[in-house]
Amino acid sequence: MLFRSGRVLQRQIDPDQLKQDMLAGCHYLNSSPDTTGRLGVTGFCWGGGMSNQLAVELGSDCHAAVPFYGAQVPAEQVPSIQAPLLIHYASNDPRINAGWPDYEQALNANGKEFEAHFYDGTNHGFHNNSTPRYDESAAALAWARTINFFKANLYS
């Protein structure tokens, strides 16, 4: 069978090794003379959760993080976040949104800079134009906010 779904392949990957690979890539980019040294991360769904985790793991080496409907990190990890966060959520995403109240409380309690948006009438994956969940107007708005956020935080 030549085709396997992303979820099947995802289950075959060691999550700790994948996180280490992502961290290595971020460290490489931060040290490369071909970059500004100001790193921003973004991701969607699983990648949104990884964006939150990278903000924790990278500390001051991450300068902006934009998770799209990603799992939140545990409250005890929030103090390690140094980057400002722009967080995008679908309004109809009970599994992911269930973690938001505790995450928001931890971000506030630790004085973290963040902005969160819930897009009315959208479902998890609203930015993916290859699925029926795609919401063009919400995706366009979220993407414009993302680009503006990166411009504000990654350019001197």
Give the ranges of each region predicted by the language model.
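Short, small-residue-biased leader/transition segments that mark boundaries at the very start
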Residues: 1-2
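C-terminal catalytic histidine-bearing segment of alpha/beta-hydrolase fold enzymes
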Residues: 104, 108-156
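Acidic catalytic loop of the alpha/beta-hydrolase fold
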Residues: 92-97, 124
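Alpha/beta-hydrolase active-site loop
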Residues: 6-33, 144
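A conserved short beta-strand
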Residues: 61-71
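Alpha/beta-hydrolase fold nucleophile elbow
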Residues: 33-44
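Short beta-strand/loop motif that positions the catalytic acidic residue
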Residues: 81, 86-89
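Gly/Ala-rich beta-loop-alpha elbow adjacent to hydrolase catalytic centers
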Residues: 43-47, 51
